[in-house]
Structure formats: C-alpha cells, structure tokens
Amino acid sequence: MTTLDDKLLGEKLQYYYSSSEDEDSDHEDKDRGRCAPASSSVPAEAELAGEGISVNTGPKGVINDWRRFKQLETEQREEQCREMERLIKKLSMTCRSHLDEEEEQQKQKDLQEKISGKMTLKEFAIMNEDQDDEEFLQQYRKQRMEEMRQQLHKGPQFKQVFEISSGEGFLDMIDKEQKSIVIMVHIYEDGIPGTEAMNGCMICLAAEYPAVKFCKVKSSVIGASSQFTRNALPALLIYKGGELIGNFVRVTDQLGDDFFAVDLEAFLQEFGLLPEKEVLVLTSVRNSATCHSEDSDLEID
C-alpha cells in the first residue's frame, strides 16, 4: 500500500518539471531546428544535380534523361537525312552524266543511220539544223560522192567519140542503146565554120563525162538535104531512151566560130543536159583549153 507520503511524492514527481528538464528540451529543439534545414536542402541539391549530369534516379531525373535521349535521337535522324540527301544528289549527278553520254551516243548513232540511208543533203540539213558538226557533214559529202561515182561506174563507160558511118548505124545508135544513156550526136560537114571547134570539144567532154555517149556523123551519111547542110550545121542532137531531148542547130550562133569545151559544157548545163561529173576522180573541164590546143592540129575525118 502506498502511504500518504508516497502519494504526495508521486504526485509531485508526476507534475514536477525541473529546470534541467527544460534545458534538455531546449537543447533538443535546437538540435531539431539545426537538422531541419539540412534535411530540406537535400532535395534541392538532388534536383540541381538531376538537371546537370542526371545522377538523381528519381522521377525528375528519369524525365530529363528521356528528354536528352529524344534530343540526341532527333539530331541523329536529322544528320542521317542530310547524309541521305547528299548521297542522292551525288548519285543523281552521276546518273545525269551517264544519261547525257548515252544521249550523245544515240544522237551520233541516229546521224550515222541517216547518212547510211542515202537521204539528200537538203533533208540532212533540215533534220540537223540545230547541229553544226562539220566532221559528219564532210563524211556525208564524201559518202555521197562515192555513191555517185559508183552509180556512174555501174553503167557503160565510153570516154571517146564514136564515128557513125551509115544511116542504119545512126538509127541503131539511138534505138538500141540503154534507155538511161545520154547520147550526143554532132552532125557536121568538113569546111563549115565551127566544125573543128565542135569536134575538139566533143573529145574533151567525152573524157570528162564517160557515162555520156558522144558521136559524130556527116550530114551526107544520114541523107540530109543541101539546104540543111548550108543553114543548120554544125548541129548537136541529144537523145535519151530513143527520144530527142535536145536539138541545137547552127551552134556557132550561140558560141561563135571558135569556142572551147568549157563554153560548150556551160551551154549544155544551162539546159540540164549533162549529168553530174565524178568530182573525186575527174578534173575540171575548165582545163580543157589545153586539151583543145593539143588536138587542134589533128585531122578529123
């Protein structure tokens, strides 16, 4: 049992606070206050650290890490796109250069095919009016000249003046020759002005135009009248395919009594009665004056 003293002492002890207890409580409050700012500063430091090198493993640190990752990923994607664009541009330039080369080769191939197709020089100029390739033009001209030379060589080559000795021979000369051959017949009689000049010109032109058949016949052989002999000689008749395509009487009225092969050539070309010459093989007929001077002393029957 408790005594009255114990109760009194106990109550005193229960409700009694000593000064030492107050001091202890003050110390505890100070310690508590001193520790509180330290604990509150920790999250701030952690947050700042999270914004720097992401050492914080909290929610904010994870978010910052994710944002940084997405930023790096975007930059890498943009760099890849730029690299791809550079590669595409490089490839396109390479492809364009190759296409240009193929296009140029195709143009040259087409040009060669057109040349092989034997088209005329006018058609060639029209099809290639935007191209100024002198090398191919020269090649085309050379090929055309070669073709003309071969065409002339396909037919007979005469290169001389044939003397017709009878009326029947005169008719056979006209009717039995190939239809593509041009025949020039000089009707003459000795002593008539211009006869020797015409005979000399015929010899020179026969050498210049081997595909043309040059002939001569006396008017008396073919039974011409004396009036024709006096008024029409020297006469030049041109036949092709059995048809008379040119008839020139008293040629001296146009050329004079003394003329040269170049004069007769120009006269016939004016009427389109001479074919194209072999430019690559034959010399110009304008040098025929020498030929005429050499043959002027020859006696032609």
Swiss-Prot record:
Gene Ontology CC, one term: cilium
Boundaries of every Phosducin domain copy: 36-299
Entry keyword set: Acetylation, Cell projection, Chaperone, Cilium biogenesis/degradation, Phosphoprotein, Sensory transduction, Vision
Subcellular location: Cell projection, Cilium
InterPro entries: Phosducin (IPR001200), Phosducin-like_reg (IPR051499), Phosducin_N_dom_sf (IPR023196), Phosducin_thioredoxin-like_dom (IPR024253), Thioredoxin-like_sf (IPR036249)
N-acetylthreonine carried by residues: T2
Region described as Disordered: spans on this chain: 18-57
Biased amino acid composition, Low complexity: 36-49
GO biological process: cell projection organization; heterotrimeric G-protein complex assembly; positive regulation of smoothened signaling pathway; regulation of G protein-coupled receptor signaling pathway; signal transduction; visual perception
Phosphoserine modified-residue sites: S20, S25, S226, S293, S296
Function: Acts as a positive regulator of hedgehog signaling and regulates ciliary function.
Quaternary data: Forms a complex with the beta and gamma subunits of the GTP-binding protein, transducin. Interacts with the CCT chaperonin complex.
Protein family according to the UniProt entry: Belongs to the phosducin family.
Name listed for the protein in its UniProt record: Phosducin-like protein
Organism: Homo sapiens (Human)
UniProt lineage: Eukaryota, Metazoa, Chordata, Craniata, Vertebrata
